[in-house]
Curated annotation (Swiss-Prot):
Keyword field: ATP-binding, Cytoplasm, Kinase, Nucleotide-binding, Transferase
Superkingdom in the source lineage: Bacteria
Reaction(s) the record says it catalyses: butanoate + ATP = butanoyl phosphate + ADP
Organism expressing this protein natively: Bacillus cereus (strain B4264)
NCBIfam families cross-referenced by the UniProt entry: butyr_kinase, PRK03011.1-5
The enzyme's E.C. designation: 2.7.2.7
GO biological process, one term: acetate metabolic process
Protein name per its UniProtKB record: Probable butyrate kinase
InterPro entries xref list: Aliphatic_acid_kin_short-chain (IPR000890), Aliphatic_acid_kinase_CS (IPR023865), ATPase_NBD (IPR043129), Butyrate_kin (IPR011245)
Enzyme class: transferase
Gene: buk
Keyword Nucleotide-binding: yes
PANTHER family tied to this protein: ACETATE KINASE, BUTYRATE KINASE 2-RELATED
Family: Belongs to the acetokinase family.
Matches recorded under Pfam families: Acetate_kinase (PF00871)
Amino acid sequence: MSVNRILVINPGSTSTKIGVFDNERPVLEETIRHDVEQIGKYKRIIDQYEFRKETILEVLHSHGINISKLNAVCGRGGLLRPIEGGTYTVNDAMLEDLKNGFSGHHASNLGGILAYEIASGLNIPAFIVDPVVVDEMEPVARISGIAGMERKSIFHALNQKAVARKVAEQLNHKYEDLNLLVTHMGGGITVGAHKKGRVIDVNNGLNGEGPFSPERAGTVPVGQLVEMCFSGEYYRDEMIKKLVGQGGLVSLIDTNDAIKVEQMVEKGDPEATLIYKAMAYQVAKEIGGASAVLHGKIDAIVLTGGLAYSKILVDEIKERVDWIADVIVHPGEDELEALAEGALRVLREEEAPKEYVVREKETVARG
């Protein structure tokens, strides 16, 4: 089998994770920490790309990686327009939306830009894979009870789909042939209903839907939320932080560290026990609801993400949902590996690269 060498790039706010893979085998994985003062010199996140590019190339050189031997570069997908899942070739339309922050400004927007900047000089393809804006929801799933307020698909698409593919392989099936309920449990929690390779419904783990998590409030009583918003006690930014960043475990028990909470549970702390059980309860309830989306025809329930390492949490969830389908636990996440696998599927011609196309304010994915 021929060897495809792939450089993968996952930019964070103050770091850039890079990896070099020979097919599925990691040759190099490194987290480049950026000096906060250095990063702070740039007014816009997008202005950091040249600095980050040079830093990446220096690190590769220091490890003896000859970039002329690369077959492709793959970056983390950023805040683009809603698109279906898959591996996309970085093109001019995508670069424009990433640079302009079409759906928001975030360090992940640098992923596609860095991939393109490095790949174009080598005359090799640049890709992104399954960004958080992946949207495969069916029309019926978009409707909310307020006109003009559609439900949106924002979730851990990269890890959910990567793990779903691994589970399908484990079950000796193709991802596109299975119905799976995949739950990513990390700083945020999302439960996706995967129908034959498409996530037809999923809770918006960023903007207040679904289970509460270590840092996010999830679904809350809306009437009380409105009262709080107009109480005069909080600014808008403070309310946003209550939902994302200072919600969930942070609000309820003053920590986002699930390991610490689990230790409290093991010591018999009644408050910690109730709150941790409530988080598991809400996850299980979300899984139960998602099972109805797939008419109860579920091949497996999958638990993944950092919290899937928690035996207490996993056992509590299993106890409530294992009657629906077998529960498969795939803890942790490996975004670098998932990016490499997405690029590899295209290089091996197992799937065609998709094209990011903007038409009349819409994005159309073409395979």
